[in-house]
Swiss-Prot record:
Belongs to the purine/pyrimidine phosphoribosyltransferase family. PyrE subfamily. This is Orotate phosphoribosyltransferase. 5-phospho-alpha-D-ribose 1-diphosphate binds at residues 114-122. It catalyses: orotidine 5'-phosphate + diphosphate = orotate + 5-phospho-alpha-D-ribose 1-diphosphate. It comes from Chlorobium phaeobacteroides (strain DSM 266 / SMG 266 / 2430). Pathway: Pyrimidine metabolism; UMP biosynthesis via de novo pathway; UMP from orotate: step 1/2. Orotate binds at residues 118, 146. Its EC number is 2.4.2.10. PANTHER family: OROTATE PHOSPHORIBOSYLTRANSFERASE, URIDINE 5'-MONOPHOSPHATE SYNTHASE. The keyword Chloroplast does not apply. CDD domains: PRTases_typeI (cd06223). Pfam families: Pribosyltran. Transmembrane segments: none annotated. It comes from the Bacteria.
């Protein structure tokens, strides 16, 4: 699956949106990737996660972890394809935590899976949790890298679709200056002012 067919899948499923969006990172953009609309289809979910799993299959992964909520579906399927434990981290009181009886042991080889990387903030929070637990970060896999590889979180980072998509600090957003209404479809949209 190379990038043009992947873009076609995003378009055909209604997952590639155009307009004025507040991203989970807080930045603004005229393009939004709603990965859930792609990953809700088993054939797309399997194909996308197969690419990620194949990239990391020789790394000795013990566990896959994803930041909630966006990365959970891709993380679970990638873990299933690798045949390893799959967990997620979630926010409590504004901080990323590992809860619900999940745990990571010192020396455990962990792969972080996210749906979309823009600034890498959520993934970086998960990486810090893992480091504090003494885990070994094997790499980061994602469905979409909006930075086209400019945001580097680990030595081994893989994206199924990588392209540079412009984003703006809110105070520099030309769409705001034009008075265009903004939509905040991300998983933290209702948690941020």
């Amino acid at each position: 699956m190379n990038q043009p067919p992947m873009l076609d899948i995003f378009r055909s499923t209604g997952a590639l949106l155009e307009g004025h969006f507040k991203l989970t990172s807080g930045r603004h953009s005229n393009t939004y990737f709603q990965c859930a609309k792609v990953l809700q289809h088993p054939e797309h979910l399997s194909a996308v996660c197969h690419k990620i799993a194949a990239h990391f299959s020789q790394k000795g992964v013990d566990t896959v972890i994803s930041p909630a909520i966006g990365g959970i579906v891709a993380g679970t399927e990638t873990g299933r394809q690798l045949g390893v434990k799959t967990i997620f981290a979630e926010r409590k009181d504004g901080r990323m935590t590992i809860r619900r009886g999940f745990s990571v042991a010192p020396g455990e080889k962990v792969l972080v899976i996210e749906d979309v990387i823009t600034t890498g903030g959520s993934v970086q929070e998960v990486i810090e949790l893992l480091k504090n637990a003494g885990a070994l970060i094997i790499g980061v896999g994602c469905v979409v890298d909006r930075s086209n590889g400019k945001v580097r979180l680990t030595d081994d980072q893989y994206a199924v679709l990588s392209m540079e998509v412009v984003s703006y600090a809110p105070e520099e957003c030309p769409l705001c200056k034009e008075g265009m209404p903004i939509d905040a479809p991300g998983s933290r949209a209702n948690q941020q002012p």
